[in-house]
């Protein structure tokens, strides 16, 4: 009886603290996050179809948000008449956005980005703005033009956070590699300067079957090739993709936000935002993870929760993501379409949740 009572009070304490025990399981047995670090969802802050010239009339998703010179910039994938391109919206308060249209164009026929030039991640080195974006020569048929494998990392640069962006076809950061853990996808991610080198937390996946994870790439020159880790940073069975990092100075802890791919009735889809935490940028324990946002605490998207991007604003951490108010989930590839962009918040400082023994 004492054990039951003490366990009950531990559970109540976790709920009050923003943590909770999670019991959801997946039909194929893929790992789950056993605890929660619940963000407070604000709802949709950017609707697809708001961009000029139909640039996002079929969807707005895969966001990358950053601050520069007192303004906020949001790169997002706009699903337009000819395919998906990285588009720009700007804001002063993270809640009201002005859509400005595409910032990249399709490459010429035969180029690695001839079918899509999307998901534009950025890094400012103090002089130049560097963009690492996702390119692919393959998509599904019209009208959706959903990017298909291989997912490649490509390079552009600019003199300001709003561009214009000049593609650097002469620079090949890295590519997919046959018979490796990144045979299908080696797409861009968050960059951290660590001592005399840069670390990129890139998205990696096999092509068949598709196993997804985050891994490390290293370089000392942003305009040179990167060296990819021989082994993934986290197990591919985690089924995660995309990265956005935040460093909590109060406890010297790194928090890596990512989206998880779940499965229901045989359909894989992005079902949650997870966060991992570590004191070491190069070592991450798959046990140290929690659910941040899913259908349980999202106000409007009851199934799909995709690709996080985090940015600090005062004493809160803003978490951008994409979702869909469709219910049930659209069948097949249609689950990728008609996304909108939402915003959720976590209070700072962040504290790593504590796993309670069963």
Task: Please report, for each region that a protein language model flagged, where it lies by residue.
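Positively charged n-region of N-terminal signal peptides that target proteins for export
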Residues: 1-4
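Bacterial N-terminal signal peptides
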Residues: 8-18
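Carbohydrate-active catalytic/glycan-binding domains of CAZyme proteins
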Residues: 21-358
């Amino acid at each position: 009886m004492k054990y039951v009572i003490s366990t009950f009070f531990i559970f109540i304490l976790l709920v009050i603290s923003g943590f909770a025990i999670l019991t959801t399981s997946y039909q194929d047995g893929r790992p789950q996050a056993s605890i929660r670090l619940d963000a407070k969802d604000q709802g949709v802050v950017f609707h697809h179809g708001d961009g000029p010239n139909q640039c996002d009339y079929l969807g707005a998703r895969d966001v990358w948000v950053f601050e520069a010179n007192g303004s906020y910039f949001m790169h997002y994938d706009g699903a337009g008449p000819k395919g998906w391109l990285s588009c720009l919206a700007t804001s002063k308060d993270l809640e009201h956005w002005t859509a400005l249209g595409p910032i990249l164009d399709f490459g010429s026929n035969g180029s690695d980005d001839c079918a899509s030039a999307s998901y534009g991640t950025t890094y400012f080195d103090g002089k130049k703005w560097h963009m690492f974006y996702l390119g692919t020569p393959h998509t599904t048929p019209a009208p959706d033009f959903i990017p298909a494998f291989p997912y490649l990392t490509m390079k552009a640069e600019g003199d300001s956070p709003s561009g214009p962006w000049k593609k650097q076809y002469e620079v090949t950061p890295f590519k997919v590699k046959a018979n490796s853990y990144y045979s299908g996808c080696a797409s861009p991610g968050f960059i951290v300067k660590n001592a005399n080198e840069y670390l990129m937390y890139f998205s990696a996946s096999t092509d068949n079957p598709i196993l997804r994870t985050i891994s490390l790439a290293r370089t000392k020159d942003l305009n040179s090739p990167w060296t990819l880790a021989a082994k993934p940073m986290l197990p591919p069975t985690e089924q995660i993709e995309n990265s956005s990092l935040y460093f909590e100075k109060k406890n010297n802890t790194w928090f890596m936000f990512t989206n998880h791919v779940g499965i229901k009735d045989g359909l894989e889809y992005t079902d949650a935002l997870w966060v991992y935490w570590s004191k070491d940028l190069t070592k991450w324990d798959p046990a140290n993870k929690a659910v941040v946002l899913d259908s349980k605490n999202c106000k409007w998207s009851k199934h799909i929760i995709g690709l996080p991007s985090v940015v600090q604003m005062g004493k809160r951490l803003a978490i951008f993501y994409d979702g869909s108010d469709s219910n049930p989930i659209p069948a097949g590839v249609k689950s990728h379409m008609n996304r909108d962009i939402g915003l959720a918040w976590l209070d700072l400082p962040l504290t790593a949740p504590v796993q309670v023994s069963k």
